[in-house]
Amino acid sequence: MATTTTTTRATAVAGARIGGGAAARSRREAVLRVVAPVAVGLIVLGAWQFLVSVVGVSDYLLPSPASIVEEFVAYWPSILSAAIITGTNALVGLVAGTILGLALAALAARWRAIDLMSAPVVAAIAVVPIVALAPVLNSMFGADSQFGRQAIAALASFVPVFVNTLRGFRQTAPVHRDLMKAYAATSGQVLRTITLPTARPFMLTGIRIASSLAVISALVAEYFGGPRGGLGSLISTSAASSAYARAWAYVVASIALGLLFYLATLLLERLVQPHRTQPHRTGGGAR
C-alpha cells in the first residue's frame, strides 16, 4: 500500500513538473514572438541611422529614420486620410475577391466540369501583372473612380482564396463521406459536419494571404493613375517632387496598413478556430 502511494505521488509530481515546464516554454515562446521582431527592427533602424550619419549616405539615396519620423508627424493628417482611402480600396477588393473565391471553389469542388473550366482562368488571373492592368482599368472606369483599384485588389485576393479553399474541400476523406451517406445524411449535412470543418483552415490561410495582396495591389493601382489621395499616389507625387523623406513616410504608413490587415485576419482565425494556437500553413496539416 505504501509503495502504491509513493508511486502515485511520484507520478503526480512528475506530471506537475511536465505541465509546469510546458507552461514555462509556452510563456517563453510568447515573449520571444514579441521580442524577436522588435529586436530585429531596432537593429535595422540602428544600422540605417549609422549608414546615414556615420558613413554619409546621401538623403537622396536613403533618408535618415529621424527625418522620416519628422515627415510622418508633420504630414500625419494627410497620411491618415490617404490610409483610409487605400484601406477602403483594399478592404472592398478583399471582401469581393474572398466571396468570389469561396463561391467558385465550392462549385469547382462539386462539379468536375467547372473545375476544368476554371483552372486556366485562375492561372491566367494569377500571372496578370498589376503594373500592366492598373492603367487599363483606371482608364476604363474613369479618372475619378476608385472601382478600378478595387477590382485589381479583388483579382489579387481571388486567386489565393480560390486555390486554398479548393484544396481544403478536397481534403475530406472519401471514407468519411461514405460513412455519412450510410447514415442517410443529406448533402447539406455532409457539407456542414465534414467538408466545411476540414476546409476551414485552408480558407483562412487563403484569406490571410489575400489580405496582404489586397493592400499591395491597391497601392500599385494607386501608383499608376486614377484619383489622387491614396498612399500609392502620394508616394509617387512625393518621389516626383524629390521629397524622399516624405515618400518614405508614406511607405511606412503603407507597411503599417498591410500589417493591420494581416493582424486582422489572424484575429479572425483565432476567433473562428479558438483551439488553434498557430496559423495554418499551406504546406502542412492542421496543428
Explain the meaning of each model-derived region.
Residues 92-122:
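Transmembrane-helix boundary motif in ABC transporter permease subunits
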Residues 112, 170, 248-287:
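C-terminal transmembrane helix and the adjacent membrane-cytosol boundary/short C-terminal tail
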Residues 164-203, 232-235:
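Short cytoplasmic-facing helical segments at TM-TM junctions of multi-pass membrane proteins
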Residues 28, 32-54:
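N-terminal signal-anchor transmembrane alpha helix
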Residues 21-26, 54-95:
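Periplasmic/extracellular loop-to-transmembrane helix junction in inner-membrane transport proteins
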Residues 1-29:
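Short, Lys/Arg-rich, polar N-terminal cytosolic tail immediately upstream
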